[in-house]
């Protein structure tokens, strides 16, 4: 074959596995220890800079997540079977508090079963082997069986009637010299109290509250001869929100069903009194949208993704996302004990007498006790122990500052239909990611994204309308079974991978991704590994 001479425009295209006939002139077959840099050209690949070992033994099957908080604070987190450790880049190991234990991390294959994503100081951790669940032991606050009678207006020559458990009481205004909604309500309450046993009544102006003393159910109905325009009887539900009075028992939950003139589904409201937090207090207040009573409304935190959070002292905390408060045990010292008096020595401890301080005496990464201290000087303080401690040793402590962990959002409005559980509930979460200011998870063939900028909220905050910032829950539709395994944000798109098909999460709106505009379309169909 004759020698061919020609110019090559660049050496930066790297290697190509295409056939010789289809390769570009600047594609190479082999490139060893070279870096194709568009600024510097083809340069020698940088060598290894050895810094430190993060372990003197083989780590084995682990999941590693790099935490790049900023240019000065970078960490390596290592998740193994039932444990998590965090290291600085120089190999220094940071303390990880584990108040809820590490049962969530139990898996013999953490490299493939643990998935993580870091957002600011929070690293969200998913164990693919754990099935999510709702908390079935704590249900949304609800009603005892009760009712209110509301005389909204009064008319001359009108009869108002209320029937409770078959007992009917009426009041006729034909002979009244003065028309008063309060007087009509009083007459109805007095008549019912005289004709019924086992009931309690309370009245505030034109509103009468009625319930049975044993909390059991009862029937109630009411009418007036003005076409039922004056008298409103509420027991569990009502047609129009505008018919509800501004005086009601605190905590009373009512379903607003709507009528032919409304364009919304049913929703629920709870009465909040202005000057009381005691359920049943009958006074002025306002109605607020709420969840149906007696339903599951929050997650089982043990089964949901956990977080690895960087604390203010630079150490870390691995915990459930349950809203607990905690104190940073960010100061070290030594202690000795004489009788019940414990003396702690720590240079420039910065505490004051009467401070409430938490201590870890056992190096178990958890609080062993909380005590009120007496400062001796800038370097020592004392407290009285309730029992015997180890005579002396090292101690970690911190002033109680009640830092609060985030908490997974709850179903605060609607019911299981209007504000359903996210589709990952009852399933295993396959992966977790961050996209367009939303935290997202993959479960089966669904992509579930939180409320915009609310990384812990998977429920809607109102069911009266669909808001652009609401959570998004969409499924990948395909003739093949498409269990989504990976999600990669790229160029304003979210690329989704299943075993045999790749999808793209798109929006019918160029600028926004909303529950109304989100859509998943097929991109390519190649087999991919789950590694």
Residue ranges and their predicted role:
Residues 72-80, 123-126, 438-443, 485-498, ...:
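Short beta-strand elements that form the blades of beta-propeller/WD-repeat-like
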Residues 155-172, 194-246, 250-279, 285:
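Polar, low-complexity export/assembly segments characteristic of proteins
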Residues 64, 180-196:
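Amphipathic, non-transmembrane alpha-helical segments in extracytoplasmic/periplasmic proteins
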Residues 215-240, 292-303, 322-413:
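Small/polar beta-strand repeat architecture
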Residues 58-69, 104-118, 428-431, 482-486, ...:
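Repeated scaffold domains used in trafficking and secretory/extracellular systems
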Residues 1-93, 237, 241-328, 400-484:
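N-terminal beta-propeller domains
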Residues 89-95, 102-157, 205-236, 240:
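Hydrophobic or amphipathic alpha-helical targeting/insertion segments
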């Amino acid at each position: 074959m004759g020698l061919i001479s020609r110019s090559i425009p660049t050496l930066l295209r790297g290697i190509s596995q295409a056939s010789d006939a289809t390769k570009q002139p600047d594609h190479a077959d082999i490139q060893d220890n070279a870096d194709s840099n568009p600024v510097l050209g083809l340069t020698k690949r940088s060598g290894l800079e050895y810094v430190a070992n993060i372990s003197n033994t083989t780590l084995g099957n682990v999941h590693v997540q790099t935490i790049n908080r900023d240019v000065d604070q970078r960490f390596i987190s290592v998740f193994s079977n039932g444990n998590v450790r965090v290291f600085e880049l120089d190999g220094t190991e940071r303390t990880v508090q584990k108040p809820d234990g590490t049962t969530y991390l139990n898996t013999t294959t953490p490299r493939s079963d643990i998935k993580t994503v870091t957002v600011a100081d929070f690293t969200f951790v998913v164990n693919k082997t754990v099935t999510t669940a709702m908390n079935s032991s704590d249900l949304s606050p609800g009603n005892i069986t009760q009712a209110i009678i509301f005389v909204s207006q009064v008319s001359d020559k009108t009869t108002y009637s209320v029937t409770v458990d078959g007992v009917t009481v009426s009041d006729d205004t034909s002979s009244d010299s003065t028309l008063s909604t309060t007087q009509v309500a009083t007459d109805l309450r007095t008549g019912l109290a005289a004709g019924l046993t086992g009931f309690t009544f309370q009245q505030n102006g034109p509103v009468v509250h009625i319930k049975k003393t044993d909390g059991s159910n009862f029937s109630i109905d009411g009418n007036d001869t003005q076409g039922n325009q004056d008298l409103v009887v509420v027991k569990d539900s009502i047609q129009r929100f505008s018919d509800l009075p501004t005086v009601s028992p605190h905590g009373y939950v009512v379903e607003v069903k709507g009528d032919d003139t409304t364009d919304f589904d049913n929703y629920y409201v709870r009465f909040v009194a202005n000057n009381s937090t005691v359920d049943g207090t009958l006074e002025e207040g306002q109605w607020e949208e709420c969840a149906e009573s007696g339903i599951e409304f929050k997650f089982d935190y043990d089964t949901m993704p956990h977080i690895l959070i960087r604390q203010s002292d630079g150490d870390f905390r691995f915990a459930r996302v349950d809203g607990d408060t905690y104190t940073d045990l960010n100061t070290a010292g030594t202690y000795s004990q004489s009788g019940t008096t414990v003396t702690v020595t720590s240079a420039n401890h910065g505490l004051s007498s009467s401070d409430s301080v938490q201590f870890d005496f056992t190096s178990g990464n958890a609080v062993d006790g909380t005590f009120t201290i007496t400062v001796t000087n800038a370097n020592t303080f004392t407290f009285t122990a309730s029992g015997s401690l180890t005579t002396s040793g090292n101690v970690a402590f911190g002033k109680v500052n009640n830092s609060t962990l985030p908490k997974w959002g709850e179903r605060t409005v609607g019911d299981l239909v209007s504000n359903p559980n996210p589709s990952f509930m009852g399933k295993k979460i396959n992966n977790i990611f961050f996209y367009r200011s939303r935290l997202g998870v993959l479960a089966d063939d669904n992509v579930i994204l939180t409320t915009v900028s609310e990384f812990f909220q998977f429920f809607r905050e109102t069911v009266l309308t669909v808001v652009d910032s609401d959570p998004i829950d969409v499924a990948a539709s395909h003739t093949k079974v498409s269990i989504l395994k990976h999600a990669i944000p790229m160029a304003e798109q979210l690329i989704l991978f299943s075993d045999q098909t790749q999808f793209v999460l798109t929006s019918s709106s160029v600028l926004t991704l909303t529950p109304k505009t989100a859509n998943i379309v097929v991109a390519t169909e190649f087999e991919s590994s789950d590694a």
